[in-house]
């Protein structure tokens, strides 16, 4: 992340988000590994079409992938995101992933209403 500008990352995020391999689109997570228990992460989120403060599923998936690759410990990994710091622990049992624990602050960033007729169900 330190070697790329935000504009470069935004363009790459947009290109990957719309890549034909992902017909419904995808969130794109970028990360730098600072230590075995600390990473820095940015999420380019579909629908928002820009970076967001945080993405819990993206953060959990990123730490899980890095843990399985042996890049981070998977135990109380601190993840610095634009919205603050999240912590992730990968719970394993005999080589199987049992749980992904995500903790961190929460904030209401908007409120809205969805009418029944807008749901199309």
Task: Locate the predicted segments by residue.
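An anionic, turn-rich surface loop/hairpin at beta-sheet edges
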Residues: 57-58
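Active-site proximal loop and beta-alpha junction motif in alpha/beta enzyme cores
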Residues: 1-54, 63-121
């Amino acid at each position: 992340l330190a070697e790329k500008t935000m504009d470069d990352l935004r363009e790459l995020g947009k290109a990957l988000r719309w890549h034909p391999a992902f017909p419904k689109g995808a969130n794109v997570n970028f990360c730098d590994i600072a230590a075995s228990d600390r990473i820095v992460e940015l999420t380019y989120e579909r629908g928002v079409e820009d970076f967001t403060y945080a993405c819990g599923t993206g953060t959990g998936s990123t730490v899980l992938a890095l843990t399985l690759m042996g890049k981070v410990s998977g135990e109380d990994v601190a993840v610095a995101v634009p919205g603050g710091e999240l912590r992730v622990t990968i719970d394993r049992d005999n080589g199987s992933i049992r749980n992904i624990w995500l903790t961190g602050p929460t904030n209401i960033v908007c409120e809205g209403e969805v009418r029944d007729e807008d749901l199309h169900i």
